Structure formats: C-alpha cells, structure tokens
C-alpha cells in the first residue's frame, strides 16, 4: 500500500544519506526510483543530492512552479518509489501533488527534510507534510555542543548565533549547527 512518508531531523541527521541508501536498495532489485530535490539547494550544483560523506547523484530539481505529479506521471508512472530531498522547501501545492501521487498513481513517496528553521518556525513544506503525511518519523542526531539529542538548527555568522533574518540561506556546516534546546538558547561562542 502506497503511503506518504515524512522523515525529518535537524542538520547532520543523515537525511540525504538515507535517500541514497533507499534508492540503492530499490535499484539493486531492478526497481526504478525518481529522486527530486529543491532547486534552491545549489551547494553541489542544482539538480543533485549530495551527502556530507561525499556521496552524490543526480536528481530532478523542484522549483516553486514545478508540478511534481506531472513530472512523475510523464517520467515514470511505474516507478517503485519517489524520493524527495530538502522537503522543507516544498510549497503547499507540492505536498498536495505528492499526496496525489500516492493516492492516484499508487506510488510510495518518501520525503526528507528539516522540520523547523533557525528561528524555530516551521518551513512551509514541513508544515504541510506534518498535516498530510501518512507516516512521520524523526531522524535523530546529537547536539554539536553536548551529548543531548539535537532538535533545533542554529545559524551562526562570524562565530555569533543568529536568531533573525531570511528563512532560506543555503549552507552546510559553516552556517548551521544541530543543537539541543539548551544550546539553542545558550550557545557557546564559536572559535572556528
């Protein structure tokens, strides 16, 4: 039975490596997958999913006006699975299109992304995935500064925490850190 999955976690929780692993497992059994990612994420070039451990592969970029349902229907309506990286950047209409892929095309859709931004506000895509997903699962990682579970993302600029600004600023370890609640509100000064 096809379902819509949302797997969320703080930065460095292994979301992208999980997508690559799931894709590999399907493809090893000669089952095709469709991988999509946000067109906003250009750290490794637009149209790629890349993990911090160095694995990378092509993906179809999703922009604000992209119709994901039509991409899947026209590209491969017999795909075994649709995998979405950086799902927090999806718009409401994208999430509804993913639900249609599950309900009409009977293809499971697995989405991976951040739940909340550095201001501790939900991303639009995450908000609607939390509402419409059949299954929701947290991917865990540890706080950058202690051994507690990281549940938030903290933005730093010049070694100082940042709590205001634009929601979307693409960056990796140089800009964002996974943190526990305590270190979100009381972070140490970075000396890197």
Curated annotation (Swiss-Prot):
Q: Where is the active site?
A: 86 (proton acceptor)
Q: Got a GO cellular component term for this one?
A: cytosol
Which positions are annotated as binding ATP?
9-16, 85-88
Where is the protein localized? Cytoplasm
Q: Which GO terms describe its biological process?
A: DNA biosynthetic process; thymidine metabolic process
The principal location of this protein is: cytoplasm
Q: Which PROSITE patterns match?
A: TK_CELLULAR_TYPE
Name the InterPro entries for this protein: P-loop_NTPase, Thymidine_kinase, Thymidine_kinase_CS
Q: Which reaction does it catalyse?
A: thymidine + ATP = dTMP + ADP + H(+)
Q: What class of enzyme is it?
A: transferase
Disulfide cysteine pairs (residue numbers):
none
Q: Which UniProt keywords apply?
A: ATP-binding, Cytoplasm, DNA synthesis, Kinase, Metal-binding, Nucleotide-binding, Transferase, Zinc
Q: Which domain of life is it from?
A: Bacteria
Q: Say which family it is in.
A: Belongs to the thymidine kinase family.
Quaternary structure, from the entry: Homotetramer.
Query: This protein is called what?
Result: Thymidine kinase
